């Protein structure tokens, strides 16, 4: 309890300072931004309060120092660290074992409420015509908003489901990234000797997965279940990932062709049923399997309208089945997904965006716990005011198949270039069987800030 009060006091104190500064700036006090420096830092606080029970879900302080140093021959060394302190420890209670994370990529835990992490550390520069970046980094594929399709190079932390921005929820990996020009195109080649997978919330976490399509159907009442830790591949050489992307421009269209040989970052709930003792016993041993990905993206602007598209075929994906006669409780198939996005800028200072995500299983056996064609729709409305310093937006994500979804209204104010404050709501709806509806009790109000130092 003293530790919680201490962290909470520090977070509230830091939170109050930029909010009062924002109020003074709004009534006319001048503010200036610091110039570029090789060593910078960002400090921020976000407070999330459940709207149903009034209980705090998190009050988290984060400090992110950033290094940018010039090296000989035009190379640069860049690094980002992150220190976090949470007053309530509801997202991942206790000290997570981080079984899904490779040892050289894990966070350092200091008790239950404080952790430190090396987010990025890489050297980049040119060698002849090639551009090289080596080290811990993020690799971004695709342009979809709200949900992901082609952006599968880096795994993701799901401690707050899909609520954080992708830049914060991605788990940077140790990667060799080489980009070489080929005529008017650009070839990117990746080698990733990092066996980190998605960071899945523990079963007592606030956003722990419970939807059957993610974790499989539960056994009948009274049947004991033993769930083991995920069996993560551990050899950084033999189990490394490789990928390539060819990007170019043709008749007004930005085009990419993408290929990735990697492990699916979602643990597969392999299941066995033991009948030897006379009473059925269920054992779930999550594991990972290779999933080749082939895809691409297109985009073009037609006046005020931008058209975006992505496609990704995951050739070997495993899905849970409720067929009790199935040997391991999962089936293998090919998952072909695509997204079509339209961005309209026809109104002053306004963006209206809509996306259709669809995923099709080429083989859909009886008992598979998801429809053969799965569809989601997203709608984004964003308007800026006061010379683009005040942003008001709402994003709506809707599952067509399950009827559940997520609505996220938000207001953000840029007090100055290095100080932003915001407030908003995250509202889930639907049944517990849906990917969004499983968090229907977790609706929340959030307020926070980020301040560059």
PLM segments and residue spans:
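Transmembrane beta-strand segments of Gram-negative outer membrane beta-barrel proteins
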Residues: 30-52, 75-83, 392
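Repeated loop/turn-to-beta-strand initiation elements of outer-membrane beta-barrel proteins
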Residues: 39, 74-77, 129-132, 184-187, ...
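Residues on the lipid-exposed face of transmembrane beta-strands in outer-membrane beta-barrel proteins
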Residues: 43-45, 63-69, 79, 120-125, ...
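Transmembrane beta-strands of outer-membrane beta-barrel pores
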Residues: 45-51, 83-87, 127-129, 138-140, ...
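Residues that define the transmembrane beta-barrel architecture of outer-membrane proteins
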Residues: 49, 55-63, 114-119, 170-174, ...
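Outer membrane beta-barrel
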Residues: 75-77, 83-88, 93-209, 251, ...
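Outer-membrane beta-barrel "beta-signal"
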Residues: 155-158, 439-453
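Detector for outer-membrane/organellar transmembrane beta-barrel domains
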Residues: 260, 299-397
């Amino acid at each position: 309890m003293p530790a919680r009060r201490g962290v909470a006091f520090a977070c509230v104190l830091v939170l109050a300072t930029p909010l009062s500064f924002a109020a003074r700036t709004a009534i006319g006090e001048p503010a200036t931004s610091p110039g570029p420096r090789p060593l910078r830092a960002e400090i921020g606080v976000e407070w999330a309060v459940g709207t149903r029970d009034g209980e705090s879900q998190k009050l988290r302080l984060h400090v992110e120092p950033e290094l940018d140093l010039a090296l000989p021959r035009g190379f640069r060394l860049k690094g980002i660290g992150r220190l976090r302190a949470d007053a309530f420890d509801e997202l991942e209670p206790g000290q997570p074992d981080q079984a899904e994370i490779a040892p050289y990529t894990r966070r350092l835990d200091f008790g239950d409420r404080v952790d430190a992490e090396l987010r990025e550390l890489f050297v980049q520069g040119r060698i002849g015509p090639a551009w090289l970046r080596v080290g811990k980094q993020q690799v971004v594929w695709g342009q979809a908003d709200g949900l992901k399709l082609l952006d599968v190079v880096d795994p993701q932390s799901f401690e707050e489901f899909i609520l954080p921005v992708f830049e914060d929820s991605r788990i940077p990996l140790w990667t060799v990234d080489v980009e070489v020009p080929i005529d008017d195109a650009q070839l990117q080649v990746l080698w990733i000797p990092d066996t980190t997978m998605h960071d899945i919330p523990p079963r007592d976490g606030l956003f722990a997965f419970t939807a059957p399509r993610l974790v499989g159907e539960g056994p009948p009442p009274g049947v004991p279940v033993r769930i083991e830790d995920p069996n993560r591949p551990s050899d950084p050489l033999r189990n490394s990932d490789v990928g390539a992307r060819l990007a170019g421009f043709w008749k007004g269209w930005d085009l990419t062709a993408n290929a990735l040989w990697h492990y699916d970052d979602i643990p597969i709930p392999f299941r066995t049923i033991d009948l030897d003792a006379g009473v059925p016993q269920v054992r779930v041993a999550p594991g990972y399997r290779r999933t080749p990905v082939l895809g691409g993206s297109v985009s073009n602007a037609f006046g005020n309208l931008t058209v975006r598209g992505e496609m990704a075929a995951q050739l070997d994906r495993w899905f849970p089945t409720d067929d009790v006669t199935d040997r391991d409780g999962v089936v293998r198939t090919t998952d072909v997904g695509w997204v079509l996005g339209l961005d309209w800028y026809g109104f002053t200072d306004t963006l209206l965006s809509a996306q259709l995500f669809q995923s099709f299983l080429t083989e859909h056996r009886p008992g598979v716990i998801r429809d053969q064609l799965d569809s989601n729709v997203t709608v984004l409305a964003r308007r800026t005011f006061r010379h683009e310093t005040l942003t008001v937006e709402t994003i709506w994500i809707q599952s067509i198949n399950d009827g559940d979804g997520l609505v996220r209204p938000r207001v953000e104010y840029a007090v100055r270039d290095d100080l932003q404050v915001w407030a908003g709501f995250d509202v889930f709806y639907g049944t517990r069987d849906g990917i969004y509806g499983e968090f229907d009790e977790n609706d929340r109000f959030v307020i926070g800030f980020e301040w560059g130092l």
